[in-house]
Curated annotation (Swiss-Prot):
Family in the record: Belongs to the beta-defensin family.
Segment forming the signal sequence: 1-19
Alphabetical keyword list: Antibiotic, Antimicrobial, Defensin, Disulfide bond, Secreted, Signal
Protein name per its UniProtKB record: Beta-defensin 134
Disulfide bonds: 25-51, 31-45, 35-52
Taxonomic superkingdom: Eukaryota
Function: Has antibacterial activity.
GO cellular component: extracellular region
One GO-annotated biological process of the protein: innate immune response
Pfam family, one: Defensin_beta_2
Length: 59
């Protein structure tokens, strides 16, 4: 019974994070768990997600 309860708690807590992923954010970026190598971090979204924008920072 405990494993089933743990699964339900995990799914309940994970749902808000999934709703925030791939949302548009600052400077037309996208919220992700981690930016790709070809993207730069410009801000943070909710739940410690990173707001990623394509391209490299200006020198």
């Amino acid at each position: 019974m405990k494993p089933l309860l743990v699964v339900f708690v995990f799914l309940f807590l994970w749902d808000p994070v999934l709703a925030e992923m791939h949302k548009k954010c600052y400077k037309n970026g996208i919220c992700r768990l981690e930016c790709y190598e070809s993207e730069m971090l410009v801000a943070y979204c909710m739940f410690q997600l990173e707001c990623c924008v394509k391209g490299n920072p200006a020198p």
